[in-house]
Each structure stands twice: as structure tokens, then as C-alpha cells.
């Protein structure tokens, strides 16, 4: 046990590897804050990072408790240790004991079990990952985790006053809209009721419409002529935003607006609740949270901030801002998913159309669709593994028309057809796919295999570009703070004078990532500068 920071720092400096579980996001920042202890990035091995790379969606998660259970090494959960501690704070006369007397032995035990489980987990992962995961993929995930841990500590400034004002406006709109819905859907009245025993007349039962009840929404819309096609496993009608958008009944539009207002209010309330004493929201990120290798977000989910094309999206994005004298730089990869497709197709003409031509018109002709907009919807639905019925709905048809579209499109893009077949064969043979940087991509189903491959490649590209950009910003000593890393987008706060430099460096990092990863389709990016997220994306 170390009781002096100098002794601990010297010990850590002498180590080749420092193995922790969640050290990047917790232990190392705590040591830095309390004792000013620093750890070299090259020394860090984080079993949480490795475990999430190994299997992002493993049942029961990646806590040391869960891994201890899997590996047969039970560790006392923190809540149990805390419970013991609270009981041992008091002596027989209920007088408080000195803090360190009862607590330190318990914490020693807790720490020892943590260390044991972490060591066993490291050995387990080292063995399991030696063949199907490259050193490059492990190194990349550690580098990204270090950057994102810093991003979490940075936080993103939210204009609390403007957020509260928008919240009040939306609540007023929701109240007015709720009143209007009572006119659209009048109360149901059960009249002419009599008591079963006495035969006496009973008062009418008046049931007002409850727009918060999905069951009532379904019943009322069916009465208006809606014929639902989607139901849950238990037979309940599915009512959600997507379903309501497809119902060509005025009353459905009114319900959709109610649910949208309700959702926006809940979102803004969660952002305001998340503001910390520094005026910023410190959203949490799992850097390899999805099976594709993409990051996932929570507390709050920064990937679900409404975009500028959504209803009240501009107003919501306008709430996220920077400190006085600074700028926000939004950087996006250009056409990332289609460039990943071009890389794997290895078709010179298709690559040319993606990079320099009009790929959506090319796809429109290949599929035989009427409009370019239909082609844009079609290609992404196709790549996401949509079924023939969904594909058919794009052109106003059904499953039969959808299958004809798919067949025609594949017939006219033979290299895509061959890629699709190859990916399906690999999945059928292995049950997983090799990722762009030599990682193992676990695939949920055959129909999602191509999409997993493409999204996985895009995730690796953006992570590699992130590492390159961070390195260059540090090399040039440009002050910056990452605010958001979502899919193919970065939001970065910097001094106003450096904004264009940061944007250009971001574009170059994306290009360079493509070169380093030996992409057969050149990559590019674009950026915008402003004061709020509305300005930059």
C-alpha cells in the first residue's frame, strides 16, 4: 500500500504495463486529481476497453462483478462493501468511530478482490483475443478511450436560460394541443347503465381521451379508418412516430405532434437536469458500445439531440454552445458509408461516382426508380438490411415490387452482388466478420451482415482520424476541447482565431486515416464554424 504520492509515482514509472479495469475513465483521473499522479499512455492496459472490443453486447455487461462471476472469481460488490462500512461506523453505544479504523480493512479486501479479478480477466482476454483481434485494433481502442475520457471531463456548455425558456414554450404548446385533441377525440360516454341487483339507473361513465395511452390512440385511429399492420408479440397494435408518419389520416398527424412535443420536453428536461456546477453537460460515452464498433452515448444520449432538419431541431441545437471568445467547429466525414461500400466493392466506376459523380442518380438508374430522392432512401434502406416490403414502400409498392427493385439493382451492380454474397458466406462460415483494422465484428444476423461490415469500417476510420487529429492539435499546441463524437461527426471548441485551422486539420485527418488504413476509396471531410451546434451541423 502506498501512502505517499512520490512513492506511488516512482512505482508506476517503473512498470512496463499498468493493468486496470476502467482506469482510463476513473482510476487515472482520480489519481491525477488527488495526488497529481500521471501515467504514460504507452503503459496503459484497460481490461474494460479490451472486454468491450471482445464482445460489446455481452449479457450482463462488463462490470468486474459480472466478469468475476463468468470466470469463477467472486468479488464483493461495492454496494455490499458500503453496507458493511455503514454498519461498522458505529460502536456498541452508537458512537461514531474514527473513519479509518473500520473502513480501511474492508477497502483492502475490496481492492484485493478487484485486483485478483482484473488479473484473471486480463489473462482470459489475452488468450481469447490473440488470434481474432489485431494489436492495431487493441491499440486504437485504448487511444480513443483516452481522448473520449477527456471529452467527458470537458463537457458541453448548455445555455440553461434559453433551454428553460424553450421548455416553457413547448409545455404551453403541449397543453394547448392536449386541449385540441379532446375536441378531435371527444370523451366516450357509457350511458343507460343500471345496477345489476336493484335495477336502478346509474350515472353515466365519461372516459376522456388520454393521448398518453398507446392503446387508446390505436382504438381511436382504428375508428377513424386506420388498418394497422404491425403488432407486438402479445398482439398489441404498435403506435410510434414511424407508424404515425405513415398513416394518411389528419387525426394521426395531430397525435404525432403530441408525441413529438412530449418527447422534446422530456429531452430538454434531461439536458437541464444533467447540467453540472460548471454549466456544462458531461455526457457519458461507451467507446465501443455497439457491435459495429460505433460509440454509444448516455446520461444524456448526445447522439439523439434532434438534428437541424427535425421539428424544433434548430432550437434544440442552438442551446449547445461555447465560452465567450471561442468557436465551435463541426467536422463531418463526407459520404462515409457509401465510401466504405466503394472500398469493399473495389469497382473503379462506382468509386468515381461516389467521390466525384452523382452516386444517387447512378443508383436510381440501376434500381429503376423514378426519382433521385427515392434512390437516396433506397440505398440506405438496402444497406441497412431492409426487407422487400420496406424497399417496395419507397416506390409506393409492396413486398413484390420491393423484391423486383432489389433484384434489378443487384443485376445492374454485379460487384455489389458479389460482395453481398461473399459477406454472407463468411458470416455463415464463421458467425462473425473481420473488421477493417483486424478486429472481430460480431454480427446479429445474416441480413445485417453487410451493414455491420460497412458501419464497422466507418467506425474504425473515424476513430483512426480522431487519434490523428488529436495528435496534430497537440503537436501544434492548439487549445481545443472535444465536445461530441457521434458516428461521422466531431464537435470541437477552440479559440476563434484557430477555428479554420482546426477545421482543415480535421479534414486532413479523415483523408490521412483513409491512406493509413489502405482504403481503396479516398476519404474526405467538411467543416462549419459557429457559436452553437445549430451553426455547425
Region locations from a protein language model:
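Active-site-proximal helix-loop-helix substrate-binding element of RNase H-like nuclease domains
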Residues: 1-5, 11, 16-126, 364-367
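Short hydrophobic beta-strand that contains or immediately precedes a catalytic carboxylate
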Residues: 19, 44-45, 211, 328-332
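Conserved "right-hand" nucleotidyltransferase catalytic core of DNA-directed polymerases
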Residues: 70-74, 84-312, 327, 337, ...
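Conserved catalytic core of nucleic-acid polymerases
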Residues: 204, 282-283, 287-290, 365-486, ...
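Short, contiguous acidic/charged loop-to-helix segments that flank catalytic cores in large enzymes
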Residues: 235, 271-276, 303, 308, ...
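Function-dense linear segments that define catalytic or interfacial modules
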Residues: 287-370
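Short amphipathic alpha-helices in soluble, non-transmembrane regions
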Residues: 502-510
